[in-house]
Design a protein with these regions (language model features):
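Short, acidic loop-to-helix structural element flanking the phosphoryl-transfer center
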Residues: 76-103, 110-113, 140
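Conserved Lys-Pro-Asp/Glu-containing loop-to-beta segment of HAD-superfamily phosphomonoesterases
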Residues: 4, 139-168
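A short, structured active-site edge motif that brings together acidic residues
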Residues: 40, 122-137
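Active-site neighborhood of HAD-like aspartate-dependent phosphohydrolases
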Residues: 1-43, 55
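Conserved H-loop
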Residues: 34, 122-126, 153
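Conserved phosphate-coupling serine/threonine residues in phosphotransfer and NTP-handling enzymes
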Residues: 12, 105-107
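A metal-dependent, Asp-based hydrolase signature
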Residues: 30, 43-75, 85-96
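Acidic, Mg2+-coordinating phosphoryl-transfer loop and its flanking beta/alpha structural elements
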Residues: 158-197
Length: 217
């Protein structure tokens, strides 16, 4: 019987919070807004990103949205970012526990595949589902397409992510969810979602294995 883990990429397997804030601040300053701290970012960041950018002082009526997104993604490529040290051990542990694994991300498909290939992670995943845009839209739709690809399941897959949006996506898809508190949103924000909260990726896999065992799988 297949048991599936659905991994988020940015902020979950990839430790890119610092890079995201640095790129965001460059984009903000270019448009006359004030830079923010990592702590402020983790307190306020959310999906969709348009309201978040407006909250930070970006005049969305003045600035072209596609240019905003292109600036951010251009800037973030210039910032240091790396997969979490626990990412490979967590993926290996999940595979050893009998899980099949896939990725669902709000990152554009080509950038997602490039990132996974660079990390040497593609071999862990049966499916890799990113989006077709730069503003993080349509992750939910891609999740629905992924669920269709997985077919009829005897137990819901478990989505591991780092944002309240991941929790929302999981609920819509009928998946279970485990949130990790080391990513783009603070743990106290994630706790409000009502899903199990892990401190790191290893604990997330352990929670997933325990949940699967309770189902007798």
């Amino acid at each position: 019987m297949d048991r599936w883990l659905i991994w988020d990429w940015n902020g979950t397997l990839l430790d890119d919070v610092g890079a995201a804030v640095a790129a965001l601040n460059r984009m903000l300053v270019r448009r006359g807004a004030q830079p923010i701290s990592v702590a402020h970012y983790r307190r306020r960041f959310g999906f969709p990103v348009r309201p978040f950018y407006a909250e930070l002082g970006v005049d969305l009526a003045k600035w072209d949205w596609d240019e905003i997104c292109e600036d951010f993604h251009s800037f973030i490529l210039e910032e240091p970012q790396a997969v979490r040290a626990s990412a490979r051990p967590a993926l290996e542990r999940a595979a050893a526990a009998g899980f099949r694994q896939c990725v669902l991300s709000a990152l554009r498909q080509d950038k997602l595949e490039d990132g996974l290939a660079s990390a040497g992670f593609l071999g862990f995943f049966a499916h890799v589902f990113g989006v077709d845009n730069l503003d993080g839209a349509s992750k939910l739709q891609r999740g629905r397409e992924l669920m269709a690809r997985l077919g009829e399941l005897e137990a819901p897959p478990i989505l591991i992510g780092d944002t309240l949006h991941d929790a929302e996506v999981a609920r819509d898809l009928g998946a279970d969810c485990i949130l990790v508190g080391c990513g783009h949103q603070l743990p106290e924000r994630l706790a409000a979602a009502g899903w199990p909260l892990a401190a790191d990726l290893i604990e997330a896999v352990e929670l997933a294995a325990a949940a699967s065992a309770k189902r007798g799988m």
